[in-house]
Amino acid sequence: MAEKRNIFLVGPMGAGKSTIGRHLAQQLHMEFIDSDTVIEERTGADIAWVFDVEGEEGFRKREEAVINDLTEQQGIVLATGGGSVISKENRNRLSARGIVVYLETTIEKQLARTNRDKKRPLLQTDCPREVLEQLAEDRNPLYEEIADITVRTDDQSAKVVANQIVKMLEEHIM
């Protein structure tokens, strides 16, 4: 790939966006950025704190500003937050400014990958499965709407998924 286009990873929490993104960036010799990490750096607090103090709406405003800034860069692999696609502005920017890769996974895999993670405000509930099912119902069509490439991440290592994405990117660009 001569041209270093942006690659934006979307998908639900626990799909592997950050882990796969790091492998992908390394393979493609691109910079890896996690939008949630940038939000935390700019805020000086973790995502859970932002949710507690500003609510989801306050967090989404911050996320929209960060995604706008990051998608204007060139040659990056960006792992977005699971809810970033809620914003039509974000969906438009992601679609227009790079190749969108949707990382699909099952609710079971999400539960297994997130069950000990206390940094996921939406899962701090007695019924995380119900939350994930509702999020999937609401968000999966939005991921599909903007995806240029879709990859299932369930039973493969992050490195294998990254390899698959590289092959698909080569086919997509040609």
UniProtKB/Swiss-Prot annotation:
Pathway: Metabolic intermediate biosynthesis; chorismate biosynthesis; chorismate from D-erythrose 4-phosphate and phosphoenolpyruvate: step 5/7. It is found in: Cytoplasm. Mg(2+) binds at S18. It comes from the Bacteria. One of its GO terms (molecular function) is shikimate kinase activity. SUPFAM superfamilies: P-loop containing nucleoside triphosphate hydrolases. One of its GO terms (biological process) is aromatic amino acid family biosynthetic process. InterPro entries: P-loop_NTPase, Shikimate/glucono_kinase, Shikimate_kinase/TSH1, Shikimate_kinase_CS. Keywords: Amino-acid biosynthesis, Aromatic amino acid biosynthesis, ATP-binding, Cytoplasm, Kinase, Magnesium, Metal-binding, Nucleotide-binding, Transferase. Pfam families: SKI. ATP binds at G14, A15, G16, K17, S18, T19, R120, Q156. Disulfide bonds: none annotated. This is Shikimate kinase.
